[in-house]
Amino acid sequence: MKTTTIAKLLTIITIVAIGYFALPKLIGLEQSVKGFSNFNEVIGIPNNIARYVTGVVELITAILLILSLTRKSEVAHILGYLLLTGTMLGGLLTEYLIRPEPKMMLVYIAIALLIIAVYQLLNTYSLKTVDHE
């Protein structure tokens, strides 16, 4: 799998960002617990279950992206960015449909990571097509 320096840098930024958001959820930091405080009442999923599942999905995303860099695995790269796309779309839905008031900084971060994911997926496809020509 051919990658550019920009693609590698974006992957590193993504790994750091998604890891930064996964760890508080998994270790139960107070701010993270508060962030998931109304899941049960709004959509019927216990707050802690929603928090842990989100944290695990984010951690898996980070691991896949690390593997895509260290093992140069195209499959890990694509799966990681597809998972990131779904996670960020879920995050945006959460901000607007579940939270009483969206936290705009989280919205901006989710949009930025979503743009990176789409860019990386499109970049992977275009590099693959160039390799086959």
Predicted regions mapped to residue ranges:
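Membrane-interface extramembranous regions
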Residues: 1-133
